[in-house]
């Protein structure tokens, strides 16, 4: 009995060898499939960090200050931090701004930097060229946000540096540090996508506290834009109430928005200030206005940002009284918007010696236009195929079959009405298919048209009219842009052409009240003037 039972148990025992082999093969197939769908196609590009840094990871418990090196490395990997940590950094830095004067007073040595515009990876190159913030005094002239796709990283990193080095790193306000421009351009959308609207609101409150100007070494007035007909002395700047959204006119607006005349130093008339027709607000100021202000306030020069420069900087005509350039423009965003192909520059001033250091752009991760995700981007492709299938399905039923079916089913006028409803639906789906097809084949034209049209939206009816409608709308928008100084061609071949095409985006956006326009001063675009003091160091290749 015992042997019989053992034999039966032996016969009933399953064969585990084949089962184990099958499971192992299945696991290998799953791993292969998983690797196929998760492995990076471009292996040199790292996958963005998904984990957000906590407050404890961002802040050093011993010092109570942000670990800016940790933030830098995390942001380089496209990482983000928890909202609580982001808000704490911004609010702590805002308290420092509020305790600073409207016009800072900074002693040399100092390194002056121009526009950053959300180009975080180029900001890393800037610190590599200019020196560590731990050992180098920095003054930034504003425009940290908009246009580029890493604006919030620039803000959080610079604000963290300010907390760590409050007496050696200084930040001024630019014209883009306001609600009006950040809503119109990209910063608000970026904050909502990467963090939340609350983070955006905290940033706006912080921007309201930024100083407006700096007196460097008692010799140089540093400001984002330039002069104002309402500002005659440095005391006029000190008296400005800066804790607010910048107005559309007045001295605060002028400090952020004004520009030198295009024929600065070679003016055809003696007018010191004229309406800024390029910006749509504020003023152009002349060489005479600049020299008068410098002489009246016993200054050597004005250092400002606000305008892209092919070489990253520009030194204007020398003052007859001092023999020093009366005006210097610094721009620190290389290959601006990924199309200008310009160099960036920073200005180092030490021991009464001014040194310009140039640098080129650095590689950065790619974002689809307007922070679009891949699903939104691919919607026209998917939509085209889905609507094609629907149209084919509906077209299976011919008009004769439709009439015969409706005659049998409905009595009187009900059948005719039903047929008309079905025909309307077929035509509507066909129209939708046409729109998706246009989007599919003309995606580049749509992007160009969105870029030209105010607010980044398509003109009404452009898609429904098909390719002809898109081309017609594009020609109309191009002609409108040309009236604002844009080149009619859309293949950008030079820095000057890029600047002309982008001129429409340099204006103050609509829906903001501006004072009555004065007679604009029309001047030709000047050729590059010979700089009285060439840079001592050439560009460093990235």
UniProtKB/Swiss-Prot annotation:
Ranges of compositional bias, category Low complexity: 16-26, 514-531
A molecular function GO annotation: calcium ion binding
Pro residues bias spans: 532-542
Keyword set includes Lipoprotein: no
Residue sites binding Fe cation per the record: 115, 117, 143
Regulation: Activated by Ca(2+)-bound calmodulin following an increase in intracellular Ca(2+). At low Ca(2+) concentrations, the catalytic subunit (also known as calcineurin A) is inactive and is bound to the regulatory subunit (also known as calcineurin B) in which only two high-affinity binding sites are occupied by Ca(2+).
Site description Interaction with PxVP motif in substrate, residues in chain: 377
Catalytic activity: O-phospho-L-seryl-[protein] + H2O = L-seryl-[protein] + phosphate; O-phospho-L-threonyl-[protein] + H2O = L-threonyl-[protein] + phosphate
InterPro entries: Calcineurin-like_PHP_ApaH, Metallo-depent_PP-like, MPP_PP2B, PP2B, Ser/Thr-sp_prot-phosphatase
A Gene Ontology BP annotation from the UniProt entry: response to hermaphrodite contact
Superkingdom per UniProt: Eukaryota
Pfam families associated with the record: Metallophos (PF00149)
Gene Ontology annotations for the cellular component aspect, listed alphabetically: axon; calcineurin complex; cytoplasm; dendrite; neuronal cell body; non-motile cilium; nucleus; perikaryon
Region (Autoinhibitory domain): 490-512
Location of region: Autoinhibitory segment: 433-440
Region Catalytic, annotated ranges: 81-365
Disruption phenotype: Shorter body length and reduced serotinin-induced egg laying as compared to wild-type. Reduced calcium responses in AFD neurons upon a temperature increase from 16 to 20 degrees Celsius as compared to wild-type. At 17 degrees Celsius displays thermophilic behavior, preferentially migrating towards hotter regions. RNAi-mediated knockdown results in an increase in lifespan. Also causes nuclear exclusion of crtc-1.
Cofactor(s), by name: Fe(3+); Zn(2+)
Subcellular compartments: Perikaryon; Cell projection, Cilium; Cytoplasm
Co-factor remark: Binds 1 Fe(3+) ion per subunit. Binds 1 zinc ion per subunit.
Location of the motif SAPNY motif: 332-336
EC number: 3.1.3.16
Notes on the domains: The autoinhibitory domain prevents access to the catalytic site. The autoinhibitory segment prevents access to the substrate binding site.
Self-association and partners: Forms a complex composed of a calmodulin-dependent catalytic subunit tax-6 (also known as calcineurin A) and a regulatory Ca(2+)-binding subunit cnb-1 (also known as calcineurin B). In response to an increase in Ca(2+) intracellular levels, forms a complex composed of tax-6, cnb-1 and cmd-1/calmodulin. Interacts with cmd-1/calmodulin in a Ca(2+)-dependent manner. Interacts (via catalytic domain) with rcan-1; the interaction is calcium-dependent and inhibits tax-6 catalytic activity. Interacts with exp-1; the interaction is calcium and cnb-1-independent. Interacts with arrd-17.
Protein name in the entry: Serine/threonine-protein phosphatase 2B catalytic subunit
Species in which this protein is naturally found: Caenorhabditis elegans
């Amino acid at each position: 009995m015992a042997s019989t039972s053992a034999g039966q148990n032996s016969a009933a025992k399953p064969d585990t060898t084949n089962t184990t082999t099958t499971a192992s093969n299945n696991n290998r197939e799953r791993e292969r499939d998983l690797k196929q769908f998760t492995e990076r196609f471009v292996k040199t590009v790292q996958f963005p960090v998904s984990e957000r840094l906590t407050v404890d990871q961002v802040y050093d418990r011993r010092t109570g200050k942000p670990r800016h090196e940790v933030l830098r490395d995390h942001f380089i990997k496209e990482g983000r931090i928890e909202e609580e940590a982001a808000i704490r950094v911004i609010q702590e830095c805002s308290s420092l701004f509020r305790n600073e004067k409207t016009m800072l007073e900074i002693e040399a040595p100092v390194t002056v930097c121009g526009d950053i515009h959300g180009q975080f990876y180029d900001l890393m190159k800037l610190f590599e060229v200019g020196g560590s913030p731990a050992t180098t005094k920095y003054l930034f002239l504003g425009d940290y946000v908009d246009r580029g796709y890493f604006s919030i990283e620039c803000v959080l990193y610079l604000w963290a540096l300010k907390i760590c080095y409050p007496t050696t790193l200084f930040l001024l306000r630019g014209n883009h540090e306001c609600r009006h421009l950040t809503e119109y351009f990209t910063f608000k959308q970026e904050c909502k996508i990467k963090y939340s609207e609350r983070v955006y609101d905290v940033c706006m409150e912080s921007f309201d506290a930024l100083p407006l100007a700096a007196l460097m070494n008692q010799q140089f007035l540093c400001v984002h834009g330039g002069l104002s007909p309402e500002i005659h002395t440095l005391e006029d700047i000190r008296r400005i109430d800066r804790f607010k959204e910048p107005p559309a006119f007045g001295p605060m607006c002028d400090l952020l928005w004004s520009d030198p005349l295009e024929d600065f130093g070679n003016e055809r008339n003696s007018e010191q200030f004229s309406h800024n027709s390029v910006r749509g607000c504020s003023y152009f100021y002349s060489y005479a206005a600049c020299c008068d202000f410098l002489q009246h306030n016993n200054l050597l020069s004005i250092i400002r940002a606000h305008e892209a420069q092919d070489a990253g900087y520009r030194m204007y005509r020398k003052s007859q009284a001092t023999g020093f350039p009366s005006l210097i423009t610094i721009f620190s965003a290389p290959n601006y918007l990924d199309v200008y192909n310009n160099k960036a520059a920073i200005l180092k001033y030490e021991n009464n010696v001014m040194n310009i250091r140039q640098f080129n752009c650095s590689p950065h991760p790619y974002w689809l236009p307007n922070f679009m995700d891949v699903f939104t981007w691919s919607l026209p492709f998917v939509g085209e195929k889905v609507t094609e299938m629907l149209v084919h399905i509906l077209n299976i039923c011919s008009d004769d079959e439709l009439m015969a079916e409706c005659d049998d089913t409905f009595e009187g006028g009900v059948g005719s009405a039903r047929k008309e409803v079905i025909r309307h639906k077929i035509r509507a789906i066909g129209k939708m298919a046409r729109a998706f097809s246009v989007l599919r084949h003309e995606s580049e034209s749509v992007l160009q048209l969105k870029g030209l049209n105010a607010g980044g939206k398509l003109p009404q009816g452009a898609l429904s009219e098909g390719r002809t409608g898109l081309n017609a709308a594009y020609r109309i928008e191009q002609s409108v842009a040309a009236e604002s100084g844009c080149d009619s061609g859309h293949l950008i071949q030079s820095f000057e052409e890029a600047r002309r095409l982008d001129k429409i985006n340099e204006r103050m956006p609509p829906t903001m009240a501006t004072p009555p326009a004065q007679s604009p001063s029309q001047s030709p675009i000047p050729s590059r003037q010979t700089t009285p003091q060439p840079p001592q160091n050439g560009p460093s290749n990235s």
